[in-house]
C-alpha cells in the first residue's frame, strides 16, 4: 500500500507532504506554501482532493491530489467562522466546518469537480463547537460543544441541510469539554475525547431505533496526574482493536485496548511524545501512528504493536512551525 502523510503547520503557513514507506520511514515529497494559517484538513472520500481551513481570512482551500499524493490548489471558498475542524459526509457531497470561536457549524457543497463551494447553511449558538463528525450511516452529524458539555446531534438531509435529530443531544459530566470523536469500524460505537478533564466517553449507537446511549467513561491520564488536563485528539486503528488519545500538557499518548465488540475500553499505558501533541493520526494499515508536536516543530512516527497496541518510536522529522494537523492518504 502506497501512503502519503500531510502535516499542516499554521505558524509557517505550510503543508508538508511525505511518502510513508512500508517500514514507517518518511520521505519528503513536497512543501506547499499556503495563503493563510492552515489548520484543519480532511481528505475527500474519493481521495482526489484535500480540503484545508485557513485563518485569519476564514476560507476553505481545495487542493487536487495527483497520483503521487502531491497537491495543487484548485479552488477557494469562504467560511462563516474561523475553521477549527473540517469533515465531509461519507459520499463526499458536503463539507462541514466547526468554528470554536464563531460558535457555529456551516455546510458547504462539494461540486462534481471536487471543489468546495460557498456555504449553504450556518447553525449558530453552538458554544465552543470543536468538531463535526458524520456517523457511519451518513445520516447523523455529531457536533461536540466544549463549552456546553454536550454533543449536539443533527440529521443530514438529501440536499445537505442539517436539522435537529430527534435525540437532540448527548451530555457529558460538568466540566468535561467534549472535543473530537472517532467511530468503531463495526459502526455500533462512538468515542469522544473530553478536553478539560482528559477523559473519553463511549457511546452505543442503535441503528434500528437511532437512539444513543453513553456506556462508559474512562480517565486517560496516569494515576496521580495532578497538572492541568488538556486533551486534544483521538483516533482508532482500522481494525478497531486499539484507540489513542493525546494530552498536550503531559505530552503523552494514552493507549487503550478496545473490546471485541467495541463497547469497552481498557487503558493499558502511556507513550511520551512530541511536545504539545495537538494532532496525530494512524495510517491505513494500522501499523503506524504519526504524532505532531505543536511546540517541538517535529513529527514522530511510531510502530503499533499488533498484539498490545504499544507504541515503538521509529524516527522524528522536522516540519514547519506549530504543526497541528496530520492526515494520511492511501493511494491504492
UniProtKB/Swiss-Prot annotation:
Gene Ontology CC entries for this record: cytosol
- Protein name, entry field: 6-phosphogluconolactonase
Q: What is its EC number?
A: 3.1.1.31
- Give GO BP annotations, semicolon-separated: glucose metabolic process; pentose-phosphate shunt, oxidative branch
- What highest taxon heads this organism's lineage? Bacteria
Q: Which family does it belong to?
A: Belongs to the cycloisomerase 2 family.
Q: Which keywords describe this protein according to UniProt?
A: Carbohydrate metabolism, Glucose metabolism, Hydrolase
* Pathway(s) annotated for this protein in UniProt: Carbohydrate degradation; pentose phosphate pathway; D-ribulose 5-phosphate from D-glucose 6-phosphate (oxidative stage): step 2/3
Per the record, what are the reactions this protein catalyses? 6-phospho-D-glucono-1,5-lactone + H2O = 6-phospho-D-gluconate + H(+)
Query: Which molecular-function annotations from GO does this UniProt entry contain?
Result: 6-phosphogluconolactonase activity
Instruction: Tell me any Pfam family this protein matches.
Output: Lactonase
The question of whether Hydrolase is a record keyword is answered with yes
Q: What does this protein do?
A: Catalyzes the hydrolysis of 6-phosphogluconolactone to 6-phosphogluconate.
TM segments? none
